[in-house]
Amino acid sequence: MISAEFNKIWSNYFHKENATLVANGKTAIFEALKILKSKHVALPTYTCHRILQACLNAGVIPYIVDCGLDLQIDVSKIPMEVDTVIVPHMFGIQADIKSLNSFKVIEDCSQCIGLPDLGKYSDVVIVSTGP
């Protein structure tokens, strides 16, 4: 009962049809990659190492892409092969998700709860509250 209520609150907050509780952020990213049928995934150079681990566990090809001064992935450096981009909002700095509209986007909102429009322009949102 509590899980169903929690899922409804989170899905509404992030503008999504569904929400699911999983054990941790690494599992959430793994599941998101499987749901999106991702094959080639870009992630920023500056991010939690568990994001790369989730990519490797999911069997996708990770592309580690340079960040700009704002610590967000540099869209101009994303290789053509990439079909999915994982975007963490590092230190609560909101990334420009709209600029990634030609990719499937997994938005990591673990560090930015409370910012406007979270989940509005991404395919999947993940939130982790622990290590």
Model-assigned labels for residue ranges:
Residues 28-30, 49-52, 93-96, 113-114:
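Short, well-ordered alpha-helical microsegments
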Residues 69-131:
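Active-site phosphate-binding strand-loop segment of PLP-dependent enzymes
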Residues 32-79:
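Conserved PLP-anchoring active-site segment centered on the Schiff-base-forming lysine
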Residues 7, 66, 108:
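Acidic active-site catalytic centers that drive phospho-/nucleotidyl reactions
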Residues 1-27, 46:
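Conserved N-terminal alpha-helix of the aminotransferase class I/II PLP-enzyme fold
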